[in-house]
Amino acid sequence: MNKQIIIIALQILVIYNISGQQTTNWENFRGNSQLTGYLNIDIPNNVDIKWMYKTGSEVKSSPVAKNNKIIIGSTDGYVYCLNMQGKLVWKFNTGNAIEASALIYDQNVIIGNLSGSLFSLKLDDGIKNWEYKTENQIMAAPNCWTSGNKSYILVGSYDYYLHCIDARTGKGAWKYESNNYLNASVAIHENRAVFGGCDGFLHLVNIPDGKAEAKIEIATYVAGSACLDNGFAYVGDYDGGFSCINLGEKKISWKWSDEKTGLPFIASPSVYNNKVIIGNRNKHVYCFNKNSGELLWKTNTGERVDASALVTSTKVLVTNMRGDILLLDLKDGKILWSYELGSPIFSNPAVIDGKIIVGAQDGNIYCLGN
């Protein structure tokens, strides 16, 4: 009997530890290197503001978090590190506005600014490890690829290049040239980087050597990041098209567009099981069957949606440019609750330790919970 009790106690402890890791760490602004936007925890109901922290200007960056530290950039040029009580741990001045989200790699914060500089900072105290300079602004969050003893940071720039940087030293490994601005983040699967550009292509690049694997024509600007799932990429475009690309065959499997509006998809999609979800500037959030492209439901949020949604096994968390935070039922798109923050929200929130963390145009970083 005592042995059974010990085994059960250990199982509970393991579950608790796993759950704790899941709730306190959100190291990539979309949750993982495939940029799927999937949350394996529940989203709180009946939320209210628990605290807010005022920065010096608009917050367009999405939050990331690790070890109870929240990292977010502001257009005042600072990277802010807050604890879960909303108190400042440290801040770092990058010298120019930050619109990109950060990446937490190991115990370091990687983030770019509008001067085109990419910084590596120590998570604990914000001390600079290195600075890498591109030739134009960085709007996208970096991503990380590791193989053996090599770790590379991948980030696009408005200098038309995808930059590959040694994560430890900050030295450039290679550059891949596109034909226009790179606004979106890179999605990564195995040895492949997948990203869209303002040149109208979805690029597939081999990470170890930086060589082009393929360019798939989307035919218009791709401002948002793609997400990857089971050998397929899902991405929206500036003309209001939403595409599913077979990465093995290197061709478009299906494409959907709303001919009535034709407004851009700025947001990145989220995927869970057979559903893929994305918001549009026409105020709607769309849910498609990821295999067929069939429209399963759409929901009018009341204002344009630039921020990417987050998805759980049953719910969708989305924000809009009116300043609303909405929780939708994944099954049918029904609005379960909405909270009026009152200031436009540019980028996706994070859910950390049962709390929703999000930045807004009014310069505040908000924490909402039960």
Question: What is each model feature region?
Answer:
Residues 1-22:
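Bacterial Sec-dependent N-terminal signal peptides
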Residues 73, 87, 112, 196, ...:
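Glycine-rich phosphate/oxyanion-binding loops and their immediately adjacent helices
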Residues 23, 30-33, 45, 51-64, ...:
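Extracytoplasmic beta-rich repeat domains
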Residues 35-39:
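Short, tryptophan-glycine- and acidic/Ser/Thr-enriched carbohydrate-recognition patches
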Residues 75-77, 82-84:
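Beta-propeller domains
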Residues 83-87, 122-125, 166-169, 206-210, ...:
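Short loop/turn segments that connect beta-strands within beta-propeller blades
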